């Protein structure tokens, strides 16, 4: 008798999880996980004032108990994914965060996350978001971003991810600016 209750409970949990995942991602199809092609793909270019092994790291990142594949970048670094073909109805889905160990440390003033695209002739900035969990508790989580790329459908574009250590017109302050781009992916919305 106990065994049948356990089986029923397991089936209900699996069904509930499947329904949750279906409704959560309904109408969205992932075209390319950018973390999967980082860091060895020939299409990626990394620019930083720090050595590459210090400036960038791909792997699981946990923010407020939620783990996502991510790309850690020190501030004042740039990561370029070259010649990514943008699909019809394409969007960049990404989650921004500053690592938890920076939240309580003194001196941090957050990270400026910038994202844009370029066809090699012109750069279009599509995201400019300051995340400052040390001074803004609402930023102590993954900050979801959905960036419409449909204006570039069918084109091969460079996807350019930048992190800066402070806002414009502020003195540079790289203290505790542990920036993470969480689960960056090109998705198609239906």
What are these model-derived regions, one by one?
Residues 17-190:
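Gly-Asp-aromatic-enriched flexible segments
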């Amino acid at each position: 008798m106990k065994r049948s209750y356990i089986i029923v409970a397991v089936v209900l949990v699996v069904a509930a999880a499947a329904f949750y995942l279906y409704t959560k991602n309904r109408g969205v199809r992932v075209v390319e996980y950018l973390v999967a092609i980082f860091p060895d793909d020939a299409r990626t270019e990394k620019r930083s004032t720090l050595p590459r092994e210090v400036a960038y790291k791909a792997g699981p990142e946990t923010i407020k108990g939620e783990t996502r594949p991510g790309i850690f970048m020190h501030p004042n670094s740039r990561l370029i994914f070259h010649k990514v073909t943008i699909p019809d109805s394409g969007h960049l889905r990404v989650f921004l965060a500053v690592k938890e160990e920076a939240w309580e440390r003194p001196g941090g003033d957050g990270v400026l996350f910038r994202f844009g695209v370029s066809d090699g002739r012109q750069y279009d900035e599509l995201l400019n978001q300051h995340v400052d969990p040390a001074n803004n508790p609402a930023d102590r989580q993954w900050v979801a971003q959905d960036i419409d790329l449909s204006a570039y459908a069918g084109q091969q574009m460079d996807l350019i991810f930048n992190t800066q250590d402070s806002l414009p017109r502020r003195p540079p302050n790289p203290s505790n600016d542990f920036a993470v781009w969480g689960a960056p992916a090109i998705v198609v919305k239906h």
